[in-house]
């Protein structure tokens, strides 16, 4: 896995604008991928950011009780701090099956795992807001383990 690439989004836009890729994912040939959208930004209701998501998760669990959910958080994230993730996850009231099990990668602490009924919460040690960018191996390990479970 490569080190953090600060301009990685430029590569994504170029890839998604490739005519072969657009054709493969059934996107109109005249559509153009852009990193940001003024139309989306103008339509965004900033008061939505303060709405709690717990009712959404309650509805998801009611409709699909056997669904497995993964939430991960970089423990060095200063935008969405890990404590905030913990607060809303614990407020869901799901049964805790396994608490704060350390996860190791190559003999080093990579984070901690808390398993709930239907939900796994992972911290990724040393990761910032963009876990795959700042700790790619640790993030990949979390995703691989979750998908294998």
What are these regions (language model features)?
Residues 1-149:
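Terminal and linker regions of secretory-pathway proteins
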């Amino acid at each position: 896995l490569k080190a953090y690439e600060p301009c990685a989004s430029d590569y994504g836009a170029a890839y998604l604008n490739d005519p072969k890729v657009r054709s493969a994912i059934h996107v109109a040939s005249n559509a153009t991928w852009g990193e940001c959208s003024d139309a989306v930004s103008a339509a965004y209701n900033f008061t939505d950011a303060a709405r709690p998501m717990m009712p959404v998760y309650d509805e998801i669990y009611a409709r699909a009780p056997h669904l497995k959910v993964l939430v991960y958080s970089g423990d060095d994230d200063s935008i969405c701090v890990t404590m905030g993730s913990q607060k809303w996850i614990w407020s869901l009231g799901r049964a805790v099956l396994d608490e704060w099990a350390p996860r190791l990668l190559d003999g080093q602490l990579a984070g901690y795992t808390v398993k709930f009924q239907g939900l796994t919460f992972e911290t990724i040690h040393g990761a910032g807001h963009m876990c795959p960018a700042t700790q790619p191996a640790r993030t990949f390990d979390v995703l691989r383990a979750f998908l294998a479970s």
